[in-house]
Amino acid sequence: MAGSLRDRAHKPSTRPRAFDDSDDDDAGLLASSSSRHEEEIVSFGRDGAKGRGASPVSDAPRVIPVTSNLDWRQDRKERLGRASNLQALGPLVSMRRAGASAVPGLASSSSTNDDINIDAINTEAQKRGLKLRSSKVTRADDTPQQLSGDVFDEQTADASAVPKASADVAGEDAEAIKALLAGQGNDSAGTGGQLIIHQETESELLQHDIDSRPEAPTLDDYAATPIDQFGMALLRGMGWKEGMGAGKGGKGPQQAAEPRKRAALLGLGAKERPTGPLNLSKPSSSSGNLQPKDKRDYKYVPVSKSDPRDYSNGRSPSSDHQPREKRPSKSHSTDLPSSHDSRRGDRDDRHARHSRTSHRQRSRSPTRSGVHDRDRRHERRRDGRDPERRSHPSSRSDRDRRSECDRDERRSSGHRR
């Protein structure tokens, strides 16, 4: 491909020129050949053509370092533009630490530590309890001349220290007084003219804020750090490594706990029942006392409507639905006539007792009228109970017995007359 590009570049153009000037063509070819940069193309990728000398992309994970010794109070003051105001005020800055300069960020001449001016909270040593002065112990072998010499040295040292401290206090007070007098127009202090605090406008504050902001990220920055890897890049800058758990010492959980939705209507401390199929496997040898469940097939027997005449005739409704092989054969019924007659006799006795009790109840209740009895007979005819009673052999025998009794009573009454 590189050879074809070279041949195409050296091939003379066949397009007609406007003025047919060969000198112009030669000059153009020389200029194009001198400005052309030949590069061998190896392959084409997502980002375009790739040459042979292209640097390989590093697969190392990205690390976002943490800014150390960051003073958020000083950063806020710089963004609001108060540093210049503090520098103009000088010694009138209130709430200033001893040994610190008026302008934050500028260390004093005596201090060599860079972090001495950082406004941190609770950095001073706290003093608690009673503080007792240690008295000097006098020994027996000390001579009076030595003791007197020591006392004289202490007195001279105290006398020399007091003027120095008073001079420092007087110097600070004098400097403050001079600054106040300079603000009223007296320039004898030598501190300059009147102190004017410059108040920045909104546009200046906005411009200062824009200048303090970092550069806007490009598309390459977003492509280099995916969204799901941004937090891990921050953790790597804080000292986290792959496979390290959370907490102190890296012994905590490695994966965050995922919240699980609680089942509906499930109280606190309750466990959800398994919703899968029940395990109906055979019991193990250890639990031999467990009996396996009966797995026989239960057939459904349909229930049909029964006729009340079957009950009156002494037949059960389920006898008609029984299969033929389960019904008793006629040969068995002929072999046992006595049992059949005994059942019939018992049934007749029950009906006779029921009729006597019903007649006795009607005779004992004088409040019943003929209209009520007629209604009951009408209901019986409508329900179809009277034909059953007439067709029943026990009811027929009762009527014959009552008619015979009536006939005997009439005969006896006729003989008496």
UniProtKB/Swiss-Prot annotation:
Molecular function per GO: nucleic acid binding
Any one biological process term the GO annotation gives: mRNA splicing, via spliceosome
Subcellular location, record wording: Nucleus
Cystine bridges: none
InterPro entries attached to this UniProt entry: G_patch_dom, Spp2-like, Spp2/MOS2_G-patch
Domain named G-patch: residues: 227-273
Region of interest called Disordered, as start-end residue ranges on this chain: 1-70, 201-221, 240-417
Main localization of the protein described in the UniProt heading: nucleus
Start-end of Basic and acidic residues biased regions: 201-214, 338-351, 370-417
Annotated Polar residues bias: 281-290
Nucleus among keywords: yes
Function: Involved in spliceosome maturation and the first step of pre-mRNA splicing.
Subunit-structure text: Associated with the spliceosome.
Protein name per Swiss-Prot or TrEMBL: Pre-mRNA-splicing factor SPP2
Organism from which the protein derives: Mycosarcoma maydis
